[in-house]
């Protein structure tokens, strides 16, 4: 991550503190209206799997406002979505990531000129009424439940999906919170090909090998490319527990263990604590623990930037905010932009 993006991360935390305290400040901002522009065209949207439900609703609303326009969405792990553009040369009109930092670190300046932070989330441990020991598990003992030999849990591939590397961060942070220095060893190191080293400054650095070398112990762990692919496994009882975002758990009606704010990557108050763990993906990219913030951009290779601008305006405006609230995911109001001067003018009024 370059210096500019590190500076943006600092100001992002500061600005979220300011704007969350005044959520009504965009009441008078313009909303995208009905238009015939783009009739008969296709709008391609790459987005995080955890955005599938709210983006399905955004798609329906956008298509209602734009008769004849077909919104085609591709859900994937956010890192994988970015690589479709940067490595595979695929074209997208909108890119929405579960970790905004992937945009400055992997896309700017060649593939994108700006990005906006628009929503937050938190990590939880989801389960169902059929999960083993579901009547026992709580915030204080969840890691002990996962240690039991007959319990199977799932998380997404850290190389592909922010929920995957955030699952590793949460588990490592749990060691200091619960004063148990074997939690990560027992749950992750003993059951996968991942390794861990401790830096001189005390930061825990988790190393993720090539995806085929993660080699999970399948009697304990189910690994998939993105976290929402594991939801059906939880529903059918193939796994007992799933590291996932709170919004996804609520959208699917799962029970869940709310993790302590000190480790669930949701709270600005604990940002310094989150930064004590890093994850190095197989491509060498190192991600530092931080509060969960989603980001959106219009890639430079967008084939329909006009419609993309209107879609992002819908996302960032009051309609999009309400959709996210109803789906259990707090919007950032107003959205916070980096590279604002490079944004389409229609979007500049919706961000700070």
Swiss-Prot record:
GO molecular function terms listed in the Swiss-Prot or TrEMBL record: molybdate ion binding; tungstate binding
Organism domain of life: Archaea
Lipid biosynthesis found in the keyword field: no
Swiss-Prot/TrEMBL keywords: Signal
Pfam families in the record: SBP_bac_11
GO biological process, one term: molybdate ion transport
Family matches, as NCBIfam families: PRK04168.1, tungstate_WtpA
Entry's family note: Belongs to the bacterial solute-binding protein 1 family. WtpA subfamily.
Name used for this protein in its record: Uncharacterized solute-binding protein MA_0280
The organism of origin for this protein: Methanosarcina acetivorans (strain ATCC 35395 / DSM 2834 / JCM 12185 / C2A)
């Amino acid at each position: 991550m370059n210096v500019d993006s590190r500076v943006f991360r600092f100001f992002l935390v500061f600005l979220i503190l300011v704007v969350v305290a005044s959520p009504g400040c965009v009441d008078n901002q313009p909303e995208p209206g009905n238009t015939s522009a783009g009739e008969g065209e296709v709008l391609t949207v790459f987005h995080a799997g955890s955005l599938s439900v709210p983006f399905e609703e955004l798609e329906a609303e956008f298509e209602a406002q734009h008769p004849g326009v077909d919104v085609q969405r591709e859900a994937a792990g956010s890192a994988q979505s970015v690589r479709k553009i940067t490595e595979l040369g695929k074209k997208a009109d909108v890119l929405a990531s579960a970790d905004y930092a992937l945009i400055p670190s992997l896309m700017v300046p060649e593939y994108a000129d700006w990005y906006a932070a628009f929503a937050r989330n938190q990590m939880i441990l989801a389960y169902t009424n059929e999960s083993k020991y579901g009547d026992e598990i709580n915030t204080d003992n969840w890691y002990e439940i996962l240690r039991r030999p007959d319990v199977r849990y799932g998380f997404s591939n850290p190389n592909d999906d922010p929920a995957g590397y955030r699952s590793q961060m949460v588990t490592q942070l749990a060691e200091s919170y619960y004063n148990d220095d074997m939690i990560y060893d027992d749950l992750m190191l003993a059951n996968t090909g991942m390794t861990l080293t401790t830096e001189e400054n005390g930061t825990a650095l988790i190393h993720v090998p090539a995806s085929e070398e993660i080699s999970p112990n399948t009697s304990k762990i189910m690994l998939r490319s993105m976290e929402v692919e594991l939801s059906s496994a939880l529903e059918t009882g193939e796994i007992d527990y799933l590291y996932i975002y709170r919004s996804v758990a609520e959208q699917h009606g799962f029970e869940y263990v709310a993790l302590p704010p000190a480790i669930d990557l949701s709270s600005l108050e604990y940002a310094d604590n989150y930064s004590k763990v890093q994850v190095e993906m197989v491509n060498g990219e190192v991600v530092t623990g931080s509060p969960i913030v989603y980001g959106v951009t219009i890639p430079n290779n967008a084939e329909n930037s006009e419609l993309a601008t209107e879609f992002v305006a819908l996302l960032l405006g009051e309609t999009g905010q309400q959709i996210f609230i109803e789906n259990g995911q707090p919007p950032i109001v107003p959205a916070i932009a980096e590279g604002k001067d490079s944004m389409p003018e229609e979007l500049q009024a919706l961000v700070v």
